[in-house]
Curated annotation (Swiss-Prot):
Cited NCBIfam families: PRK05182.1-2, PRK05182.2-3, PRK05182.2-5, rpoA
Cross-referenced InterPro entries: DNA-dir_RNA_pol_insert, DNA-dir_RNA_pol_RpoA/D/Rpb3, DNA-dir_RpoA, RBP11-like, RNAP_asu_C, RNApol_insert_sf
MF-aspect GO terms: DNA binding; DNA-directed RNA polymerase activity; protein dimerization activity
Record remark: domains: The N-terminal domain is essential for RNAP assembly and basal transcription, whereas the C-terminal domain is involved in interaction with transcriptional regulators and with upstream promoter elements.
Name of the protein in question: DNA-directed RNA polymerase subunit alpha
UniProt keyword annotations, A-Z: DNA-directed RNA polymerase, Nucleotidyltransferase, Transcription, Transferase
Gene3D superfamilies: 5' to 3' exonuclease, C-terminal subdomain, DNA-directed RNA polymerase, insert domain, RNA polymerase, RBP11-like subunit
Subunit (UniProt): Homodimer. The RNAP catalytic core consists of 2 alpha, 1 beta, 1 beta' and 1 omega subunit. When a sigma factor is associated with the core the holoenzyme is formed, which can initiate transcription.
EC number: 2.7.7.6
Record lineage: Bacteria, Pseudomonadati, Chlamydiota, Chlamydiia, Chlamydiales
Length: 377
């Protein structure tokens, strides 16, 4: 446990209160497969920092189940055909690769994650063939007769039968990340005629992001991160982003342990948390009513800033543009405002105050406060 003496005070970072999720117009599959996420405001540069990290974690870090091998009655190897089935084994393998499975909740085997065998008996008689027009399609949903896996695409055709038959089919399902060619997949107790497949574990199909400018109060020097995520349905986009964030946090925690010093961030001042009347009484104060140096007072006077309200609504970069206004004066003003629990660049919109009307509004509020005091007196 680190001692409080090791803490370092950092200025506040602008952070989003929440991440907004919305569907993408015209996207196939709806919000369960494609979604857009917007996070703002962020400090300048953090949009690309977070966007790039999230994109990489989404593409390489997420796990999902996939079929890694199968066996079937009469199938000895993948370079053969089966009598009564239209597709040869090579095409059956390709169709199995297109199968999408998900499993909730995830369950672990003793000693770690392991593969599971799902067995199905496919019985097709003459009446089934007649009802199907002579060719009976066997789908992924038909093969999931046991276990806790759910097919994302249950109507996906695996093979087509043209004569009455009974088949025993075994699918082996495992969890993994990314893409694994068949030669890298190691199976425990592999059956004699068990055919191993290439496995695409990653449920994320596409990730794009871009960064826009956004504002905090009157200051436009902030980022808005827009992240668009498309999955294959094994994991929803919302879950994918949450999982990727946890993966990044897990990795960053290793670097965080390098030093005991802790950063304590100043909290952004929210006028919603303060009593509005108290804030208004501070905002209508004249610049000459607070203890500033003659130099700072003259700088503000030359900039035609007469009240605290006119001062706090100004973004920091704009103040530095005024003539003879330097960093020394800026530091003094920021410290004084901090004592008053105020800051530069405040959003006063809930008071109906903006840069275009701040002077008039401060006069109006000052008169309102004066009349209120006289009435109470």
């Amino acid at each position: 446990m680190s001692d409080s003496s090791h803490n370092l005070l950092y200025n506040k970072f602008e952070l989003p209160e929440s991440v907004k999720m919305s569907p993408v117009e015209g996207a196939v599959g709806g919000i369960d497969k494609v979604a857009r996420f917007v996070a703002d405001p962020l400090e300048k540069g953090m949009g690309h920092t977070l966007g790039s990290a999230l994109r990489r974690a989404l593409l390489i870090g997420l796990e999902a189940p996939a079929i890694v091998s199968f066996s079937m009655t009469g199938v000895l190897h993948e370079y053969m055909a089966v009598e009564g089935i239209i597709e040869d084994v090579t095409n059956i393998v390709l169709n199995l690769k297109g199968s999408l499975l998900k499993k909730y909740p995830l369950q672990d085997c003793e000693g770690g994650r392991c593969s599971q065998k799902l067995r199905a008996t496919i019985s097709i008689d003459a009446s089934d063939l007649a009802a199907a027009g002579g060719q009976k399609e066997v789908t992924l949903g038909d093969l999931l007769q046991e276990g806790t896996f759910e097919a994302v695409n249950p109507e996906h055709v695996i093979f087509t039968v043209t004569r009455p038959m009974q088949l025993e089919v075994m699918l082996r399902v495992a969890f993994g990340r990314g893409y694994s060619p068949s030669e890298r997949i190691v199976l425990e107790e592999r059956g004699m005629n068990e055919i191993v497949l290439d496995a695409a574990f990653s449920p994320v199909v596409l990730v794009n992001y871009f960064v826009e400018d956004t504002r905090v109060g009157q200051d436009t020097d902030f980022d808005r991160l827009v992240l668009q995520v498309e999955t294959d349905g094994r994991v929803a986009p919302k879950e994918a982003v949450a999982f990727a964030t946890q993966i990044l946090s897990k990795h960053f925690s290793v670097f965080e342990k390098m030093d005991e010093k802790r950063i304590v961030f100043e909290e952004a001042i929210s006028v919603e948390k303060e009593n509005k009347d108290d804030i208004l009484h501070k905002l209508v104060l004249g610049i000459n009513e607070i203890e500033l140096s003659v130099r700072s007072t003259n700088c503000l006077s030359n900039a035609n800033i007469e009240t605290i309200g006119e001062l706090v609504i100004m973004p920091e970069p704009r103040l530095l543009q005024f003539r003879n206004f330097g960093k020394k004066s800026l530091c003094e003003i920021k410290n004084k405002l901090k004592e008053m629990k105020l800051e530069l660049g405040m959003d006063l919109s809930q008071f109906g105050v903006g840069l275009d009307n701040v002077k008039e509004k401060m006069k109006w509020y000052a008169e309102k406060i004066r009349l209120s005091k006289n009435t109470k007196g």
